[in-house]
Amino acid sequence: MTLYQIKPLFQSLLRPTMFWLYKHHVTANHITLTALALSLFTGLLLVLVAQPILFLLLPIVLFIRMALNALDGMLARECNQQTRLGAILNENGDVISDIALYLPFLFLPESNASLVILMLFCTILTEFCGLLAQTINGIRSYAGPFGKSDRALIFGLWGLAVAIYPQWMQWNNLLWSIASILLLWTAINRCRSVLFMSAER
């Protein structure tokens, strides 16, 4: 069970916004680049001003990013805007945005740099394994338990928590360790989905 499974409900809430954007000639690629720019700006701000209180921004930005990610996909599929450039921007944008938004955790007090870097590596690995499934079977794997939406929820809540209760940062490394384990589990599940689908065929 992952948050990805409630994506259809989220999309239905965003559909009026999608039609408004389409009517005003906003393309899927515009939305993708906006999400990337927002993530890079926020990440840079959190790195340059490494104050826990600023991590209040993280849940807000992550929610906006999730909405933008949903909108770019909807515009691409439902408004006939799918392009090869869009696919490249989407996949690379997701990985770069994840790094930009989660790298600032490295600069928080009590954070072990090696654990944060390991977590970021595992994040990239899960996305790679999802794409690997698409390359082999033609269907991208979104298997959990720690997909993009789940990460946004957990890390957004943690950003809120350390902003309000800075003393909670003593648990940073425990969270990075658990997150890395869940990410590796996710990567394994995505690879297994490739094997199962191949066996069924």
Feature map (PLM): residue ranges:
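Glycine-rich active-site/cofactor-binding loop and its immediate structural neighborhood
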Residues: 55-87
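Hydrophobic alpha-helical transmembrane segments
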Residues: 1-63, 100-201
